[in-house]
Amino acid sequence: MPVDQSFNAPLSEVDPEIAAVLEQELGRQRGTLEMIASENFVPRAVLQSQGSVLTNKYAEGYPGRRYYGGCEFVDVAEQLAIDRAKSLFGAEFANVQPHSGATANAAVLAAIAQPGDTILGLELAHGGHLTHGMKLNFSGKLYDAAAYGVDPDTFLIDMDVVREKALEHRPQVIIAGWSAYPRHLDFAAFRSIADEVGAKLWVDMAHFAGLVAAGVHPSPVPYADVVSSTVHKTLAGPRSGVILSRDTALAKKLNSAVFPGQQGGPLMHVIAAKATAFKIAATEEFADRQRRTIQGAQILAERLVAADSTEAGVSVLTGGTDVHLVLADLRNSPIDGKQAEDALHEVGITVNRNSVPFDPRPPMVTSGVRIGTSALATRGFGETEFTEVADIIAETLKPGSDLAALRARVLTLTDGFPLYEGLTQ
């Protein structure tokens, strides 16, 4: 009996509703400026790897040790991803199976801590992550979570305070990492504190992994017992996670924590896409993109601390940035984070409202916006374009701005930098 007609039919025929969604989303991405700090545009080669026949293959286990037959080719794909990740970051161990950053983080904690152990991470409201000890998250339910914060005057992490917290709580795990913090972390100081209290040091570099890969950000790998990351964000790979370590003695625990501890079958099509992304991340072209990413963020920060922005009540947390994002502080502005997000959306710039440390407003409103430059650097933006984007953002955040005129300026930029040429869905 032949395969039924729908098997080989195109998406537009089988499911026109979803086909329309894909077309509309492609149009949105092409016609707007994507500046959510956790988003990026993946290369077409990554899309091709992920949208492949590898989606059909079940492969519980690890290369050479599977619980299913027919894994000879997916073994090659996973081993390529492992070897490329290790080479890219200078690690001795890599697990490329985590479905997401959160899954990777859950596996890390399962490998290096026991339920009820104390963990110490950056406070969520000060730029930390849900998986670093938020009470409603698994990390806050399974573990005794303590937190360090930022200085109320500088908004920087004070390592003396981190040490005091570590001595007070005696955690089994110290977490260095963030979701909204615009400066480098002092990995050597974190290592010293962890050694002093007998803790494991886990670095979550989900946001800055691409910068590390390009050599434009300090690497945590030589200092941490374990490093986790997403593969999207600055790495511009598929939405997924990875775990790294220089300690081969932890390899068995980390592998077991991922499978069977957190997951069953790995997503082999996603793992193949990770391999492709890691290969691209080792190129000079990728490194140039990361340099432009940081340059763009610093141009934006400088524009938002200019006199006219300051007069409009806008400031920049920590006064600048070392990474791919800027945190605009609107506590003295007549508009809040939600209103700023909406205004920027209207002109065609996508950001997310974000709480700032000691924020007087609720989390669904906030007093800040988090603005990232990775996707625009991927699109090809350089100094000239980032200067224009920064001015558009600064003008949008002023009360009474001509949003229609600003939208026209955005369209000039998007028209000049086509995205996914030739792609229809």
From Swiss-Prot:
Localization annotation: Cytoplasm
Functional description taken from the UniProt entry: Catalyzes the reversible interconversion of serine and glycine with tetrahydrofolate (THF) serving as the one-carbon carrier. This reaction serves as the major source of one-carbon groups required for the biosynthesis of purines, thymidylate, methionine, and other important biomolecules. Also exhibits THF-independent aldolase activity toward beta-hydroxyamino acids, producing glycine and aldehydes, via a retro-aldol mechanism.
NCBIfam families xrefs: PRK00011.1
Catalytic activity: (6R)-5,10-methylene-5,6,7,8-tetrahydrofolate + glycine + H2O = (6S)-5,6,7,8-tetrahydrofolate + L-serine
Protein's name in the database: Serine hydroxymethyltransferase
Entry keywords, A to Z: Amino-acid biosynthesis, Cytoplasm, One-carbon metabolism, Pyridoxal phosphate, Transferase
EC nos: 2.1.2.1
Annotated InterPro entries: PyrdxlP-dep_Trfase, PyrdxlP-dep_Trfase_major, PyrdxlP-dep_Trfase_small, Ser_HO-MeTrfase, Ser_HO-MeTrfase-like, Ser_HO-MeTrfase_PLP_BS, SHMT-like_dom
Gene3D superfamilies: Aspartate Aminotransferase, domain 1, Type I PLP-dependent aspartate aminotransferase-like (Major domain)
Bridged cysteine pairs (disulfide): none
Family listed: Belongs to the SHMT family.
N6-(pyridoxal phosphate)lysine found at: 233
Organism: Clavibacter sepedonicus
GO annotation, biological process: glycine biosynthetic process from serine; tetrahydrofolate interconversion
Record Pfam families: SHMT
Gene Ontology CC entries for this record: cytosol
Annotated (6S)-5,6,7,8-tetrahydrofolate binding sites: 124, 128-130
